[in-house]
Amino acid sequence: MAVETTDTLVVGAGQSGIAMSEHLSALKIPHIVLERSRIAENWSSMRWDSLVANGPAWHDRFPNLTFEDVHPDAFPGKDRVARYFNDYAAMIGAPIRTGVEVRLVRHSQGRPGYTVTTSDGIFEARRVVAATGPFQVPSFPDIVPGDAAVHQLHSSAYKNPGQLADGAVLVVGCGASGSQIAEELCKAGRQVYLSVGEHYRPPRAYRQRDYCWWLGALGLWDEVKSKRKKRHVAFAVSGYEGGRTVDFRRLAHMGVTLVGVTRAYENGTLHFADDLVRNIAEGDEAYFEVLRDADAYIARKGMDLPPEPEAWQRYEDPGCLKEPILSLDLDRAGIGTILWATGFRYDFSWLDVDAFDEQGMPLHKRGVSAENGIYFLGLPDLTNRASAFIYGCWQDAKHIADHIVIQRNYDAYTRA
């Protein structure tokens, strides 16, 4: 089988891979993008039916193409987002090959660069960009055994309330996915329990500006790490039903029963940490901190934005917060499904290079790996807070492309 060569091979054709291709093309760097499924596959198949983007259309896009059929302040649905990326890839003429799985990347023998083994043959590339993003492999906590008498699924496999087994549902995880799915299930008439861990809960909008705008105005997109994200916590923000602040007290008053972090399972009973009150309080403080910072910014800039006193009001504490549930017999509670909205983990098993620490996490600086010629793109906090978002990965891709130009100049040097 013939070996195909290129300068840069990009793995993944989601938002990161497409952004990378645009910048490589602009700098006339030969490259190929390999995608094991379809363009923007995660948006097409690993999302539930009612999902919308977490940011408004004016913000959650690449600079050179708008959502022409979506109001700038609206939140496009998952299928529209998938179509946006397909349209963008076509617009820039991205050299994407779909249905090609990258199985192994390792150093080439006796020559610079990397040998890439795929389902469609062998490629040789001087550089490889891992643009597979943060949503690689569903993460399941090892708590409830697979043979327990309850149906279990990950949020990436959830589509709508009708697919779930009869009975109540425990949603574990309170980020954008868990909070939206819990509300959707409650509105569908299900009894819902929501396991709430540490989270960052900003206002969806405040004083006529969306939270994405406030992130930019306050310089928070550029933070290397959010002040409240000393370690990973759930990001509770959603564009669900036109965009509304995630408020767990409001969900409780709708009928959702809040519990703390899911800790253990024994003989049909789940045990929860006694941390619900603290987790809710810390989420509240993050929310009010944004309001305080926004008010100070408006005053400092002399902006004419009307006050929003109702944003400072808080729902009364529900009973489940006053007297938290610490254990739950699944059978007695009638729970037929546990839905794990517990995020994803990385899988770089195909990348056989010295670019990872002892925990298997990528070693890099702004996406430039410790291994010469290997790059990472689209990971959370790669460069700053924006890096895993559409807005941010495009900027990071430009930095990586510029670095590749410099490396190509070194490669091309010959002594006069």
Sequence positions of predicted segments:
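A short acidic, helix-capping loop that chelates divalent metal ions and anchors anionic groups
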Residues: 68-72
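Flavin (primarily FAD) cofactor-binding/catalytic cores of flavoenzymes
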Residues: 2-45, 75-416
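Redox-cofactor-proximal catalytic regions of oxidoreductases
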Residues: 41-66, 251
